[in-house]
Amino acid sequence: MVTVNRNYLKLPGSYLFSTIAGKVSAFQKENPEARILRLGIGDVTQPLAPAIIESLHRSVDEMAHQETFRGYAPDLGYEFLRDAIAKNDYKDRGCNISADEIFISDGAKSDSGNIQEIFGADNKVAVCDPVYPVYVDTNVMAGRTGAYNKEKENFDGVIYMPCLESNGFLPEIPEEVPDLIYLCFPNNPSGAAITREKLQEWVDYANRTGAVIIYDAAYEAYITETDIPHSIYECNGARSEEHT
């Protein structure tokens, strides 16, 4: 007999951003003159840069001719793109990351959700609070959490690390040792950024305890300060072989 993954039943309702969209839509209908500042889902507000438009047009034109037509890309992504990422996003910042360690995907949301599948269901998860919902929801569906606690409005069995004004909206090392630590900087949703010194403390902690940090740097392009790392690999020991 076919059964369902009952972990899905722990989720309290719809995806957070769908709920927000529904509430905004209802409010607009009741208040058509109101100006709404959308600070929920991070939708884009500006047109694509000319360089991107030119590249898209050029790529479409290539697909119109037999000599330049391309079928499926390699499973890990085009080599020229991986080489460019390795050089510009990593090596130019002193990170020892080579092209064969880079995988082209459809974005951080999918990767954040998919990477947890390689870990066992008995791993303890730590997340910032507030948190990007994907980190928690995917682990709920994988069976790494307890039930949803309506009173606390969070899930039992998850280590929540409060990010408050009093601690600069940065998580502090938890008392309970986690196995998987989700960090996102610049942070979604708070916008807080972490210094290289503070991030190094997390890397050192993970190496001491054997934890794995899942680091989401989707918003690194907003960084302008020199003491704010664009990648966790700017920290010593972030790669496992550097520690061992």
Model-derived features: positions:
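Generic enzyme active-site microenvironment
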Residues: 214
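N-terminal small-domain helix-loop-helix segment of the aminotransferase-like
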Residues: 2-106
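Helix C-cap/helix->beta junction micro-motif
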Residues: 31, 208-209
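Conserved small/polar residues in nucleotide/adenosyl-binding loops
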Residues: 241-244
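Conserved core of the PLP fold type I
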Residues: 66-206, 220-239
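Walker B catalytic acidic pair
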Residues: 217
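Generic beta-sheet signal
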Residues: 36-37, 179-181, 211
